[in-house]
Amino acid sequence: MNGAARSNLGKRLLAEEAGITKLDADALSGGRGGQLVMHPGNDVGAACASGSFRHDGMVVVPASSNTLAKIAHGISDNLVQRAAQVTLKERRPLVIAHRESPIGLTEIEAMRKVTEAGAVVAPLSPGLYLQPESVNDLIDFMAGRLLDLLGVDHQLPIRWDEHLAEQREAKRERHSTPR
């Protein structure tokens, strides 16, 4: 992770994926994080930048327009960009969570290029239809969507059908309560 470890969404993904709830040296060195390893952002020679490194997929979150453009054009100035290039080359799942708005034509073209190369572009736009009550609800939604896109099971409340079922149950309870 480059920058994402400091963001709420990055922290939520670490919690859901690896059970890491506190970012400290122990957690990030593998103590509680299992196989989690940190590399400096400029270490383009790290194992995860090699096609022989086995993994189930990669999420770039949050992805700036600069990072998106560099991935789209095969430019690898840092480890995140290099690992993303290798992920595409090896035909593994790559999800790019673009963070910027408004989206201009150059970003749209970069999104087209990475999509054609096999990536999924998932703008960081949370589902307001679930009627979030807090910023954490919005973060949970986006973390759950990103995990879904990688095929990772989770328990985050993001399903529309589950939300509808909860609404119906609440409505039944309101109507069955004597006034």
Which residues are covered by each model-predicted region?
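A cross-family phosphate/adenosyl-ligand binding-site feature
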Residues: 1-94, 102-179
